[in-house]
Amino acid sequence: MTITQPDLSVFETVESEVRSYCRGWPTVFDRAVGSRMYDEDGHEYLDFFAGAGSLNYGHNNAVLKRALIDYLERDGVTHGLDMSTTAKRRFLETFQNTILRPRDLPYKVMFPGPTGTNAVESALKLARKVKGRESIVSFTNAFHGMSLGSLAVTGNAFKRAGAGIPLVHGTPMPFDNYFDGTVEDFIWFERLLEDQGSGLNKPAAVIVETVQGEGGINVARAEWLRALADLCERQDMLLIVDDIQMGCGRTGAFFSFEEAGITPDIVTVSKSISGYGMPMALTLFKPELDVWEPGEHNGTFRGNNPAFVTATATLEAYWADGSAMEKQTRKRGEQVEQHMIAITEENLADVKEYRGRGLVWGLEFHDKDRAGRVAKRAFELGLLIETSGPESEVVKLLPALTITPDELDEGMKTLARAVRETA
C-alpha cells in the first residue's frame, strides 16, 4: 500500500504530546464499517484493534446504528445523570433477563461513570467501605486504569510514574505463571496473609484480570482462578474481577470468568458494554455489598442514555439466543491459533511464545523491539494492530467478534508477512 503523507500539522501543533496511538498509525481516518477503517485518502485498513476492545461488534454496526438513530430522531433523553429513564429501564431489564438470570448471577448494577477506570475506582471504594480496610492486592503486570486509585493497583512502571505522587494501599502479588511454574501458586501470598510478622496489612479485596490485556496477554488458568477465589473466601477478602477489556464476549463467554466457574464479589465492565464504542461502564456486586449511601459515588456522565440504547440492542442481537456468540468466538479463536502455530513454526528462532483465549491473542518475540517493528510494517500493509506488555514486547490482536472467517485469514496472513519482513 502506498500512503501519501497526510496533513498532520494541527495534531502536531495543537494537540498535546500525550497522544499515542496516532503516532503508530500516521494517517487521518475518516470512516469505518465492520472490521474496516478508511483514511481521508481512501486507503483501507483491516482493524485488528477494535477500539482497544470497545468495538467487539465492529464499527458502525448496522443493527446498533439503527437503534441509536431511531432513539435520537424521537428526541430521546441523552443526558440523564442517574435519573430513571425509559432507556435505562429497558437496558436493566434486558441485562437482567439476558445476562444475569441465565447465569444465576444476583448482582446489583451500578453506573459509576463513563469509563473503565470509573468502574475500578468505585469497586475499590466499595470493597474498602464493606471491609473497613484500606489495602488492595493486585497482580504483576496488571492494568486497571489511569486515575490514581486504579494506578495504585496497576503494575506498569511507566504508567505508574505518571501519577507524580506515591501510589499507596496497593500490594502486588505474582500473577499465574509469573515464576514459569517453579513456585507453587499462592504460596507467597498465603504465607504473607498468615504470618503476623509479614508486614502485609490484611487486604479488603483482591483485583484480577482473567487475561491481562495491556500486561502482555497473560492468560490465567481456570484452576488458578478457582484457587484464588477459594483463598479470598477463606481469608475474608472480596474478589474483584476486572472484565473491562476481556468481558462482553472477548474470551468466548459473556464474562471471562465463566470458564473458571467462579462468582466474583465485584465485577467491573466497560469498553464493549455499549456495543457501539460509546462511553459506558458498570460495577456489578453481590446484593449484600450494596452499602452505598445515596450519592456517595456519582458522576456527571454516568447516565449516558444513547449508550443504554445501543447496549440493549447489542444484548438483544448477539446474546439473547444463548451460546451462539460464544461458540462463534471460540471457533474464530481456533482459526487464529492455527495461524499462530504456522507463524511460530516459520519463525522458531524469533518467536518466544503465542498465547490467548477466544479473540484476544498475543505474539511475543525474543527481541523485545520486534513487536513494534511488526506493528509498523503491518500498518504499512493495511493492518491495524497494537503492542502490549511492560516493554511493548508483545503483538496484540483484538479483532471484532463479528469479523468474518475470510477477514480473519486475510489479517493473519498480513501479520505473517509483517513478521517475515521484519526479521
UniProtKB/Swiss-Prot annotation:
Any idea which GO molecular function terms this record carries? Answer: diaminobutyrate-2-oxoglutarate transaminase activity; diaminobutyrate-pyruvate transaminase activity; pyridoxal phosphate binding; transaminase activity
Q: Which cofactor does it need?
A: pyridoxal 5'-phosphate
Report the residues modified as N6-(pyridoxal phosphate)lysine.
271
Q: Which Gene3D superfamilies match?
A: Aspartate Aminotransferase, domain 1, Type I PLP-dependent aspartate aminotransferase-like (Major domain)
Instruction: Look at the named UniProt entry and state the broad enzyme category this protein falls under.
Output: transferase
| Enzyme Commission code | 2.6.1.76
| Top-level division of the source organism's lineage | Bacteria
Name the keywords, alphabetized: Aminotransferase, Pyridoxal phosphate, Transferase
Give the matching InterPro entries: Aminotrans_3, Aminotrans_3_PPA_site, Dat, Ectoine_EctB, PyrdxlP-dep_Trfase, PyrdxlP-dep_Trfase_major, PyrdxlP-dep_Trfase_small
Pfam families to which the protein is assigned, alphabetical: Aminotran_3 (PF00202)
Q: Kindly list the biological process annotations in GO that this record carries.
A: ectoine biosynthetic process
UniProt pathway annotation: Amine and polyamine biosynthesis; ectoine biosynthesis; L-ectoine from L-aspartate 4-semialdehyde: step 1/3
Q: Give the family per the record.
A: Belongs to the class-III pyridoxal-phosphate-dependent aminotransferase family.
Q: What is this protein called?
A: Diaminobutyrate--2-oxoglutarate transaminase
